[in-house]
Amino acid sequence: MIEKIKNTRSHRKFTDKKISKEEILKILEGARYSASAKNSQFLRYSYTVDDEKCKKLFSTIALGGLLKLEDKPTLEERPRAYILISAKKDTNIPDFLQYFDIGIASQNIALLANELGYGACIVMSYNKNVFKEVLEVPDDYETRAVIVLGEAKDIVKLTDSKDENDTKYFIENGTH
C-alpha cells in the first residue's frame, strides 16, 4: 500500500488520451465508499469527460499557482476529465468535518485513478460558478473541490526536502 501512496502524486500535465465514462464511474465508486464523519455521507459528485466541457473548465482552474508560466499546462496538456465534489448547503455538518470527508474522498479518487493508469490533482482554486453551470449542479449545493484527471504527461520524482519552509515546486525537463 505504501508504494501505491508514493506513486499517487499530483499531476498537472496530461496526454490527449481520453478517460471513459465507465472508468470515471469506477473511480467514483471508490469515493462513494469513503469513510464519512458521523457516517453523514453528504458529499455529491459530478463529472465530465466531454472534451468541449473539459476545455471550458480548464480555463477556470489554477494548476500549480507557484509555477512559472512556461511550466504551466497548455490547452493541449489539459485534463481529460473533471470530478467536482459538492455538498448540500443546508447540511448541519461543520465545515471542518466536511473538509475532512472531502480529503478522504479526494485521496480515494486519486488512488483509484492511479490504479487505472491515470494521474490526478486535487484543486481548490477554480471558478465555482462556471463549474456549477457546466456540470449542472443544483442551486441547493455548494461546490467544495475539483479533481482533474488524465494520463499523466509529467514525471514525479520523490525527494526529501532539505528545508521544511521551502514549499516551491521543483521542475526540470518535465520532472517535478
Question: Model-found features: residue ranges?
Answer:
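Acidic, surface-exposed loops and disordered segments
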Residues: 1-176
